[in-house]
From Swiss-Prot:
Cystine residue pairs: none
CDD domains named in the record: CobQ_N, GATase1_CobQ
Organism for this UniProt entry: Trichormus variabilis (strain ATCC 29413 / PCC 7937) (Anabaena variabilis)
Keywords: Cobalamin biosynthesis, Glutamine amidotransferase
Protein's recorded name: Cobyric acid synthase
Residue ranges constituting the GATase cobBQ-type domain according to the UniProt record: 250-441
Family that this chain belongs to: Belongs to the CobB/CobQ family. CobQ subfamily.
Molecular function in Gene Ontology: ABC-type vitamin B12 transporter activity; catalytic activity
Primary role: Catalyzes amidations at positions B, D, E, and G on adenosylcobyrinic A,C-diamide. NH(2) groups are provided by glutamine, and one molecule of ATP is hydrogenolyzed for each amidation.
Annotated active site: C331 (nucleophile), H433
Signal peptide location: none
InterPro entries assigned to the protein according to its UniProt record, in alphabetical order: Class_I_gatase-like, CobQ/CobB/MinD/ParA_Nub-bd_dom, CobQ_GATase1, CobQ_N, CobQ_synth, GATase_3, P-loop_NTPase
Pathway(s) this gene product operates in, as recorded in its UniProt entry: Cofactor biosynthesis; adenosylcobalamin biosynthesis
Amino acid sequence: MKSIMVVGTTSHAGKSLISTAICRILSRRGWRVAPFKGQNMALNAYVTANGGEIGYAQAVQAWAAGVVPWVEMNPILLKPQGDMTSQVIIRGRPVGRVNAADYYEQYFEPGWRAIEESLQHLGTEFDLVVCEGAGSPAEINLKHRDLTNMRVAKYLNAPTLLVVDIDRGGAFAHVVGTLELLEPEERQLIKGVVINKFRGQRSLLDPGIKWLEERTGIPVVGVIPYLQEIFPAEDSLDLLERKTHKAHADLQITVVRLPRIANFTDFDPLESEPTVAVKYISPKQDLGHPDAVILPGTKTTIADLILLQKTGMAEAIQNYAASGGTVLGICGGYQILGQMIADPEGIEGQAGRYQGLNLLPIRTVITGQKIARQRQVSSNFPQLGLPVNGFEIHQGRSRVEPQGDSQAFQPLFDDVNLGLVDSCQSVWGSYLHGLFDNGPWRRAWLNRLRQQRGLKSLPTGVANYREQREQMLDNIATEVENHLDLTLFLP
Protein backbone atom coordinates (compact mmCIF):
# COMPACT_ATOMS: atom_id res chain seq x y z
CA MET A 1 0.00 0.00 0.00
CA LYS A 2 1.42 3.38 -1.02
CA SER A 3 1.28 5.84 1.86
CA ILE A 4 2.71 8.97 3.46
CA MET A 5 2.69 9.52 7.22
CA VAL A 6 2.60 12.97 8.84
CA VAL A 7 3.52 13.26 12.53
CA GLY A 8 4.28 16.31 14.66
CA THR A 9 6.65 17.14 17.47
CA THR A 10 3.72 18.56 19.48
CA SER A 11 0.01 19.15 19.29
CA HIS A 12 -0.88 22.09 17.02
CA ALA A 13 2.34 21.68 15.02
CA GLY A 14 0.28 21.77 11.84
CA LYS A 15 -0.20 18.08 11.03
CA SER A 16 -3.79 18.51 9.89
CA LEU A 17 -2.99 21.45 7.64
CA ILE A 18 0.03 19.74 6.05
CA SER A 19 -1.91 16.49 5.57
CA THR A 20 -4.80 18.39 4.01
CA ALA A 21 -2.47 20.27 1.68
CA ILE A 22 -0.77 17.04 0.57
CA CYS A 23 -4.18 15.52 -0.20
CA ARG A 24 -5.03 18.45 -2.47
CA ILE A 25 -1.53 18.61 -4.02
CA LEU A 26 -1.55 14.94 -4.99
CA SER A 27 -5.17 15.06 -6.13
CA ARG A 28 -4.28 17.91 -8.50
CA ARG A 29 -1.43 15.76 -9.82
CA GLY A 30 -3.85 12.99 -10.72
CA TRP A 31 -3.52 10.68 -7.72
CA ARG A 32 -6.62 9.11 -6.17
CA VAL A 33 -5.88 9.93 -2.53
CA ALA A 34 -7.53 9.05 0.78
CA PRO A 35 -6.85 10.76 4.12
CA PHE A 36 -6.53 8.66 7.27
CA LYS A 37 -6.30 9.27 11.01
CA GLY A 38 -6.41 6.10 13.07
CA GLN A 39 -7.65 7.73 16.25
CA ASN A 40 -8.91 11.25 16.71
CA MET A 41 -10.14 13.00 19.84
CA ALA A 42 -12.44 15.84 18.81
CA LEU A 43 -15.87 17.32 19.34
CA ASN A 44 -15.98 18.63 15.78
CA ALA A 45 -17.58 15.75 13.91
CA TYR A 46 -19.05 15.10 10.48
CA VAL A 47 -21.69 12.58 9.41
CA THR A 48 -20.89 10.52 6.32
CA ALA A 49 -23.46 9.51 3.72
CA ASN A 50 -24.07 6.19 5.51
CA GLY A 51 -24.70 7.92 8.86
CA GLY A 52 -21.29 7.29 10.43
CA GLU A 53 -19.37 9.84 12.51
CA ILE A 54 -15.79 10.87 11.79
CA GLY A 55 -13.65 13.82 12.81
CA TYR A 56 -14.51 16.96 10.85
CA ALA A 57 -10.83 17.40 9.97
CA GLN A 58 -10.85 14.09 8.08
CA ALA A 59 -13.95 15.19 6.18
CA VAL A 60 -12.10 18.37 5.16
CA GLN A 61 -9.12 16.26 4.09
CA ALA A 62 -11.41 14.06 2.00
CA TRP A 63 -12.83 17.13 0.30
CA ALA A 64 -9.27 18.32 -0.29
CA ALA A 65 -8.58 14.99 -1.98
CA GLY A 66 -11.71 15.39 -4.08
CA VAL A 67 -13.41 12.32 -2.62
CA VAL A 68 -16.43 11.61 -0.42
CA PRO A 69 -15.70 11.17 3.32
CA TRP A 70 -15.77 7.54 4.52
CA VAL A 71 -15.82 6.17 8.07
CA GLU A 72 -12.64 4.23 7.23
CA MET A 73 -10.77 7.53 7.05
CA ASN A 74 -11.14 7.90 10.84
CA PRO A 75 -11.93 4.48 12.34
CA ILE A 76 -11.72 5.64 15.98
CA LEU A 77 -13.27 8.90 17.16
CA LEU A 78 -13.22 9.85 20.84
CA LYS A 79 -15.67 12.56 21.92
CA PRO A 80 -14.84 13.93 25.40
CA GLN A 81 -17.80 14.18 27.75
CA GLY A 82 -16.15 15.60 30.87
CA ASP A 83 -15.06 13.88 34.09
CA MET A 84 -12.24 12.18 32.16
CA THR A 85 -14.71 10.14 30.09
CA SER A 86 -15.26 9.94 26.34
CA GLN A 87 -17.78 8.45 24.00
CA VAL A 88 -16.02 5.87 21.82
CA ILE A 89 -16.99 5.69 18.15
CA ILE A 90 -15.53 2.86 16.05
CA ARG A 91 -16.09 2.71 12.29
CA GLY A 92 -18.63 5.52 12.63
CA ARG A 93 -20.81 3.94 15.32
CA PRO A 94 -20.89 4.66 19.08
CA VAL A 95 -19.83 1.56 21.03
CA GLY A 96 -19.64 2.86 24.58
CA ARG A 97 -18.45 5.43 27.06
CA VAL A 98 -15.25 4.92 29.01
CA ASN A 99 -12.84 6.75 31.28
CA ALA A 100 -9.25 7.41 30.28
CA ALA A 101 -7.78 4.76 32.58
CA ASP A 102 -9.91 1.93 31.15
CA TYR A 103 -9.94 2.99 27.50
CA TYR A 104 -6.89 1.11 26.29
CA GLU A 105 -7.68 -2.01 28.30
CA GLN A 106 -11.12 -2.23 26.73
CA TYR A 107 -10.59 -0.81 23.26
CA PHE A 108 -6.94 -1.16 22.26
CA GLU A 109 -7.30 -4.50 20.47
CA PRO A 110 -10.67 -3.84 18.78
CA GLY A 111 -9.42 -0.37 17.91
CA TRP A 112 -6.30 -1.69 16.21
CA ARG A 113 -8.37 -4.25 14.29
CA ALA A 114 -10.59 -1.41 13.06
CA ILE A 115 -7.49 0.52 12.00
CA GLU A 116 -6.04 -2.46 10.10
CA GLU A 117 -9.33 -3.24 8.37
CA SER A 118 -9.86 0.40 7.44
CA LEU A 119 -6.37 0.75 5.98
CA GLN A 120 -6.78 -2.46 4.00
CA HIS A 121 -10.08 -1.22 2.58
CA LEU A 122 -8.63 2.18 1.66
CA GLY A 123 -5.61 0.49 0.10
CA THR A 124 -7.82 -1.39 -2.36
CA GLU A 125 -9.76 1.72 -3.38
CA PHE A 126 -7.11 4.45 -3.57
CA ASP A 127 -3.66 5.01 -5.09
CA LEU A 128 -2.19 6.46 -1.91
CA VAL A 129 -3.20 7.04 1.71
CA VAL A 130 -2.09 10.20 3.55
CA CYS A 131 -1.98 9.30 7.25
CA GLU A 132 -2.00 11.86 10.04
CA GLY A 133 -0.73 11.21 13.55
CA ALA A 134 -1.96 12.73 16.80
CA GLY A 135 -0.11 14.77 19.39
CA SER A 136 3.51 13.62 19.47
CA PRO A 137 4.91 10.21 18.46
CA ALA A 138 7.38 10.39 21.36
CA GLU A 139 5.11 10.39 24.40
CA ILE A 140 7.02 7.81 26.43
CA ASN A 141 4.14 7.05 28.80
CA LEU A 142 1.77 6.36 25.88
CA LYS A 143 3.97 4.71 23.25
CA HIS A 144 3.17 1.14 24.29
CA ARG A 145 -0.48 1.79 23.46
CA ASP A 146 -0.04 4.02 20.43
CA LEU A 147 -2.85 3.62 17.91
CA THR A 148 -2.22 6.47 15.53
CA ASN A 149 1.44 7.51 15.23
CA MET A 150 4.47 5.30 14.59
CA ARG A 151 2.53 2.05 15.01
CA VAL A 152 0.61 3.03 11.87
CA ALA A 153 3.79 4.18 10.12
CA LYS A 154 5.51 0.86 10.89
CA TYR A 155 2.47 -1.15 9.81
CA LEU A 156 2.52 0.61 6.42
CA ASN A 157 6.30 1.08 6.23
CA ALA A 158 5.31 4.64 5.38
CA PRO A 159 7.84 7.38 4.63
CA THR A 160 7.15 9.89 7.38
CA LEU A 161 7.22 13.68 7.64
CA LEU A 162 7.99 15.24 11.03
CA VAL A 163 6.29 18.64 11.38
CA VAL A 164 7.46 21.25 13.90
CA ASP A 165 5.90 24.61 14.81
CA ILE A 166 8.68 27.21 14.80
CA ASP A 167 6.33 30.06 15.74
CA ARG A 168 6.20 28.86 19.36
CA GLY A 169 9.97 28.71 19.73
CA GLY A 170 12.18 25.74 20.57
CA ALA A 171 11.74 24.10 17.17
CA PHE A 172 15.24 22.62 16.94
CA ALA A 173 15.01 21.16 20.43
CA HIS A 174 11.60 19.70 19.59
CA VAL A 175 12.92 17.98 16.47
CA VAL A 176 16.09 16.60 18.07
CA GLY A 177 14.26 15.55 21.23
CA THR A 178 11.52 13.78 19.30
CA LEU A 179 14.02 11.89 17.15
CA GLU A 180 16.07 10.89 20.21
CA LEU A 181 13.00 9.38 21.84
CA LEU A 182 11.96 7.31 18.82
CA GLU A 183 13.04 3.68 18.48
CA PRO A 184 15.70 3.08 15.78
CA GLU A 185 13.20 1.41 13.43
CA GLU A 186 10.81 4.34 13.92
CA ARG A 187 13.48 6.95 13.32
CA GLN A 188 14.45 5.23 10.06
CA LEU A 189 10.97 5.99 8.74
CA ILE A 190 11.40 9.76 9.25
CA LYS A 191 12.46 10.90 5.77
CA GLY A 192 12.09 14.64 6.19
CA VAL A 193 11.41 17.50 8.58
CA VAL A 194 8.91 20.28 7.85
CA ILE A 195 9.36 23.59 9.67
CA ASN A 196 5.89 25.09 9.88
CA LYS A 197 4.51 28.58 10.67
CA PHE A 198 7.73 30.42 9.78
CA ARG A 199 7.72 34.23 9.87
CA GLY A 200 10.75 36.25 8.97
CA GLN A 201 13.75 36.19 6.69
CA ARG A 202 14.62 32.72 5.42
CA SER A 203 18.37 33.44 5.28
CA LEU A 204 18.41 33.83 9.06
CA LEU A 205 17.02 30.31 9.40
CA ASP A 206 19.45 28.61 7.01
CA PRO A 207 22.32 28.14 9.52
CA GLY A 208 19.92 26.39 11.88
CA ILE A 209 18.68 24.13 9.09
CA LYS A 210 22.25 23.22 8.15
CA TRP A 211 23.04 22.34 11.78
CA LEU A 212 19.83 20.30 12.13
CA GLU A 213 20.49 18.27 8.99
CA GLU A 214 24.07 17.55 10.07
CA ARG A 215 22.97 16.69 13.60
CA THR A 216 20.14 14.33 12.60
CA GLY A 217 21.07 13.15 9.11
CA ILE A 218 17.51 13.96 8.03
CA PRO A 219 16.80 16.67 5.44
CA VAL A 220 14.53 19.64 6.04
CA VAL A 221 12.18 19.23 3.08
CA GLY A 222 9.99 22.24 3.74
CA VAL A 223 9.79 25.62 5.43
CA ILE A 224 6.13 26.60 5.37
CA PRO A 225 5.25 30.26 5.99
CA TYR A 226 2.66 31.23 8.56
CA LEU A 227 -0.62 30.95 6.67
CA GLN A 228 -3.44 33.39 7.35
CA GLU A 229 -6.21 31.19 5.96
CA ILE A 230 -8.95 30.22 8.43
CA PHE A 231 -8.36 26.49 8.69
CA PRO A 232 -10.87 24.37 10.65
CA ALA A 233 -9.37 23.67 14.08
CA GLU A 234 -9.88 20.34 15.85
CA ASP A 235 -10.38 21.76 19.32
CA SER A 236 -11.76 24.95 20.81
CA LEU A 237 -8.69 26.09 22.75
CA ASP A 238 -8.07 29.11 20.53
CA LEU A 239 -11.63 30.37 20.17
CA LEU A 240 -11.49 32.97 22.94
CA GLU A 241 -8.22 34.34 21.50
CA ARG A 242 -9.39 34.59 17.90
CA LYS A 243 -9.00 38.05 16.42
CA THR A 244 -12.55 39.12 15.66
CA HIS A 245 -12.16 42.81 14.82
CA LYS A 246 -13.12 43.75 11.28
CA ALA A 247 -12.80 47.32 10.12
CA HIS A 248 -15.98 47.18 8.05
CA ALA A 249 -18.14 44.84 10.14
CA ASP A 250 -21.78 45.92 10.27
CA LEU A 251 -22.92 43.12 12.57
CA GLN A 252 -21.55 41.69 15.81
CA ILE A 253 -22.53 38.07 16.53
CA THR A 254 -21.60 36.52 19.86
CA VAL A 255 -21.13 32.77 20.26
CA VAL A 256 -21.14 31.46 23.84
CA ARG A 257 -18.15 29.13 24.09
CA LEU A 258 -19.64 26.34 26.15
CA PRO A 259 -17.10 24.13 27.99
CA ARG A 260 -17.84 21.16 25.71
CA ILE A 261 -18.65 23.14 22.58
CA ALA A 262 -19.10 20.84 19.59
CA ASN A 263 -19.00 21.53 15.88
CA PHE A 264 -17.90 25.15 16.18
CA THR A 265 -16.98 24.76 12.50
CA ASP A 266 -20.66 25.68 12.05
CA PHE A 267 -19.54 29.30 12.38
CA ASP A 268 -16.68 29.36 9.87
CA PRO A 269 -19.09 30.61 7.16
CA LEU A 270 -20.13 33.50 9.40
CA GLU A 271 -16.49 34.38 10.04
CA SER A 272 -15.95 34.44 6.28
CA GLU A 273 -18.60 37.15 5.82
CA PRO A 274 -16.80 40.51 5.35
CA THR A 275 -19.51 42.48 7.16
CA VAL A 276 -19.83 40.14 10.17
CA ALA A 277 -17.62 39.99 13.26
CA VAL A 278 -17.95 36.77 15.28
CA LYS A 279 -16.92 36.96 18.92
CA TYR A 280 -16.57 33.97 21.25
CA ILE A 281 -17.16 34.58 24.95
CA SER A 282 -17.03 32.31 27.99
CA PRO A 283 -20.19 31.88 30.09
CA LYS A 284 -18.55 34.01 32.79
CA GLN A 285 -18.12 37.05 30.54
CA ASP A 286 -20.57 39.90 30.02
CA LEU A 287 -22.98 39.20 27.18
CA GLY A 288 -23.04 42.81 25.99
CA HIS A 289 -25.43 43.97 23.27
CA PRO A 290 -24.57 42.11 20.05
CA ASP A 291 -26.84 41.81 17.04
CA ALA A 292 -27.34 38.10 17.74
CA VAL A 293 -26.36 35.50 20.34
CA ILE A 294 -25.71 31.88 19.39
CA LEU A 295 -25.72 28.88 21.70
CA PRO A 296 -23.71 26.22 19.84
CA GLY A 297 -23.77 22.46 19.99
CA THR A 298 -22.32 20.73 23.04
CA LYS A 299 -21.43 17.16 24.00
CA THR A 300 -22.68 17.71 27.57
CA THR A 301 -25.91 19.64 27.20
CA ILE A 302 -27.11 19.35 30.79
CA ALA A 303 -23.76 20.21 32.40
CA ASP A 304 -23.42 23.26 30.15
CA LEU A 305 -27.02 24.30 30.89
CA ILE A 306 -26.29 24.15 34.63
CA LEU A 307 -23.14 26.22 34.13
CA LEU A 308 -25.07 28.87 32.19
CA GLN A 309 -27.51 29.10 35.08
CA LYS A 310 -24.79 29.27 37.74
CA THR A 311 -22.82 32.00 35.97
CA GLY A 312 -25.86 34.15 35.24
CA MET A 313 -25.43 33.76 31.48
CA ALA A 314 -28.78 31.96 31.21
CA GLU A 315 -30.59 34.93 32.79
CA ALA A 316 -28.61 37.35 30.62
CA ILE A 317 -29.71 35.52 27.47
CA GLN A 318 -33.33 35.44 28.68
CA ASN A 319 -33.25 39.20 29.33
CA TYR A 320 -31.57 39.80 25.98
CA ALA A 321 -34.31 37.84 24.20
CA ALA A 322 -37.05 39.64 26.18
CA SER A 323 -35.67 42.97 24.96
CA GLY A 324 -36.00 41.84 21.35
CA GLY A 325 -32.53 40.42 20.79
CA THR A 326 -32.00 37.57 18.34
CA VAL A 327 -31.01 34.20 19.83
CA LEU A 328 -30.14 31.04 17.89
CA GLY A 329 -29.54 27.62 19.39
CA ILE A 330 -27.99 24.78 17.38
CA CYS A 331 -28.30 21.13 18.46
CA GLY A 332 -27.46 21.12 22.18
CA GLY A 333 -27.97 24.88 22.18
CA TYR A 334 -31.45 24.30 20.74
CA GLN A 335 -32.24 21.89 23.58
CA ILE A 336 -31.00 24.42 26.16
CA LEU A 337 -33.41 27.04 24.79
CA GLY A 338 -36.35 24.73 25.50
CA GLN A 339 -38.53 24.28 28.57
CA MET A 340 -36.99 21.14 30.00
CA ILE A 341 -34.32 18.48 29.43
CA ALA A 342 -34.80 15.04 30.99
CA ASP A 343 -32.10 12.39 31.29
CA PRO A 344 -33.92 9.41 32.83
CA GLU A 345 -31.11 6.92 32.14
CA GLY A 346 -28.24 9.15 33.26
CA ILE A 347 -26.71 9.14 29.78
CA GLU A 348 -24.92 12.44 30.44
CA GLY A 349 -24.25 11.78 34.12
CA GLN A 350 -26.75 11.97 36.94
CA ALA A 351 -30.31 11.07 35.98
CA GLY A 352 -32.82 13.88 36.40
CA ARG A 353 -34.93 16.66 34.90
CA TYR A 354 -33.54 20.12 34.28
CA GLN A 355 -35.30 23.38 33.49
CA GLY A 356 -34.16 25.05 30.30
CA LEU A 357 -34.20 28.74 29.34
CA ASN A 358 -37.88 28.45 28.32
CA LEU A 359 -37.44 30.48 25.15
CA LEU A 360 -38.79 27.73 22.87
CA PRO A 361 -41.73 25.37 23.60
CA ILE A 362 -39.82 22.10 23.39
CA ARG A 363 -39.12 19.34 25.89
CA THR A 364 -36.14 17.06 25.32
CA VAL A 365 -35.44 13.54 26.55
CA ILE A 366 -31.84 12.28 26.36
CA THR A 367 -31.76 8.68 25.12
CA GLY A 368 -29.07 6.10 24.48
CA GLN A 369 -29.83 5.94 20.76
CA LYS A 370 -27.96 8.56 18.76
CA ILE A 371 -29.30 10.17 15.60
CA ALA A 372 -26.57 10.79 13.01
CA ARG A 373 -27.63 11.50 9.45
CA GLN A 374 -27.28 13.91 6.56
CA ARG A 375 -30.32 16.05 5.74
CA GLN A 376 -31.72 17.96 2.77
CA VAL A 377 -34.68 20.18 3.63
CA SER A 378 -36.49 23.30 2.49
CA SER A 379 -36.76 26.43 4.64
CA ASN A 380 -39.90 28.13 5.91
CA PHE A 381 -37.96 31.01 7.49
CA PRO A 382 -36.37 33.52 7.08
CA GLN A 383 -37.29 32.96 3.44
CA LEU A 384 -39.64 30.33 2.07
CA GLY A 385 -38.34 27.56 -0.14
CA LEU A 386 -34.57 27.85 0.23
CA PRO A 387 -32.79 24.48 -0.08
CA VAL A 388 -30.80 23.72 3.08
CA ASN A 389 -28.30 20.88 3.50
CA GLY A 390 -26.67 19.81 6.75
CA PHE A 391 -26.45 16.95 9.22
CA GLU A 392 -27.77 15.90 12.60
CA ILE A 393 -25.74 14.45 15.50
CA HIS A 394 -27.68 14.24 18.76
CA GLN A 395 -28.95 11.85 21.42
CA GLY A 396 -31.92 13.92 22.56
CA ARG A 397 -35.46 13.67 21.19
CA SER A 398 -37.35 16.97 21.34
CA ARG A 399 -41.13 17.32 21.36
CA VAL A 400 -42.93 20.57 20.60
CA GLU A 401 -45.43 21.42 23.33
CA PRO A 402 -48.91 22.69 22.34
CA GLN A 403 -49.34 26.45 22.58
CA GLY A 404 -52.42 28.57 23.21
CA ASP A 405 -51.47 30.67 20.20
CA SER A 406 -50.84 28.21 17.39
CA GLN A 407 -48.98 30.88 15.41
CA ALA A 408 -46.55 31.82 18.19
CA PHE A 409 -43.93 29.37 16.94
CA GLN A 410 -43.46 27.91 13.48
CA PRO A 411 -41.37 25.06 12.04
CA LEU A 412 -38.12 26.38 10.65
CA PHE A 413 -38.05 23.79 7.84
CA ASP A 414 -40.45 21.49 6.03
CA ASP A 415 -39.42 18.82 8.55
CA VAL A 416 -41.12 20.01 11.74
CA ASN A 417 -38.69 18.05 13.94
CA LEU A 418 -35.62 19.99 12.81
CA GLY A 419 -36.27 23.36 14.41
CA LEU A 420 -38.52 26.23 15.46
CA VAL A 421 -38.70 30.01 15.23
CA ASP A 422 -40.98 32.40 17.09
CA SER A 423 -43.45 34.68 15.33
CA CYS A 424 -41.12 37.69 15.70
CA GLN A 425 -38.23 35.72 14.18
CA SER A 426 -36.19 36.56 17.26
CA VAL A 427 -35.67 33.13 18.86
CA TRP A 428 -34.45 30.37 16.58
CA GLY A 429 -33.51 26.76 17.25
CA SER A 430 -32.39 23.90 15.03
CA TYR A 431 -30.82 20.46 15.17
CA LEU A 432 -29.08 21.09 11.86
CA HIS A 433 -25.30 21.42 11.78
CA GLY A 434 -23.89 23.15 8.71
CA LEU A 435 -26.81 25.59 8.63
CA PHE A 436 -24.66 28.60 7.73
CA ASP A 437 -22.85 26.66 4.99
CA ASN A 438 -25.96 27.32 2.90
CA GLY A 439 -25.18 30.71 1.35
CA PRO A 440 -28.68 31.98 0.46
CA TRP A 441 -30.11 30.91 3.85
CA ARG A 442 -27.19 32.50 5.70
CA ARG A 443 -27.60 35.79 3.86
CA ALA A 444 -31.37 35.82 4.40
CA TRP A 445 -30.82 35.30 8.15
CA LEU A 446 -28.18 38.04 8.27
CA ASN A 447 -30.41 40.40 6.29
CA ARG A 448 -33.01 40.26 9.03
CA LEU A 449 -30.35 41.45 11.48
CA ARG A 450 -29.30 44.15 9.02
CA GLN A 451 -32.88 45.36 8.65
CA GLN A 452 -33.10 45.79 12.42
CA ARG A 453 -30.09 48.09 12.17
CA GLY A 454 -31.53 49.97 9.21
CA LEU A 455 -28.86 48.59 6.89
CA LYS A 456 -29.25 47.67 3.25
CA SER A 457 -29.81 43.97 2.57
CA LEU A 458 -27.00 41.90 1.10
CA PRO A 459 -27.53 39.86 -2.09
CA THR A 460 -28.83 36.38 -1.28
CA GLY A 461 -27.86 34.80 -4.58
CA VAL A 462 -24.48 33.71 -3.26
CA ALA A 463 -22.70 30.38 -3.47
CA ASN A 464 -22.65 27.96 -0.59
CA TYR A 465 -19.64 27.99 1.73
CA ARG A 466 -18.37 24.86 -0.01
CA GLU A 467 -17.03 27.02 -2.85
CA GLN A 468 -15.16 29.28 -0.42
CA ARG A 469 -13.78 26.20 1.30
CA GLU A 470 -12.57 24.84 -2.03
CA GLN A 471 -10.76 28.11 -2.71
CA MET A 472 -9.22 27.99 0.78
CA LEU A 473 -7.99 24.44 0.18
CA ASP A 474 -6.51 25.44 -3.17
CA ASN A 475 -4.76 28.43 -1.60
CA ILE A 476 -3.31 26.34 1.22
CA ALA A 477 -2.17 23.60 -1.16
CA THR A 478 -0.51 26.07 -3.52
CA GLU A 479 1.35 27.78 -0.68
CA VAL A 480 2.52 24.50 0.82
CA GLU A 481 3.48 23.06 -2.58
CA ASN A 482 5.68 26.10 -3.21
CA HIS A 483 7.64 25.37 -0.03
CA LEU A 484 7.58 21.56 0.31
CA ASP A 485 9.59 18.96 -1.61
CA LEU A 486 7.68 15.67 -1.72
CA THR A 487 10.18 13.90 -3.98
CA LEU A 488 11.41 11.56 -1.23
CA PHE A 489 7.87 10.55 -0.32
CA LEU A 490 6.42 9.50 -3.66
CA PRO A 491 7.03 6.18 -5.41
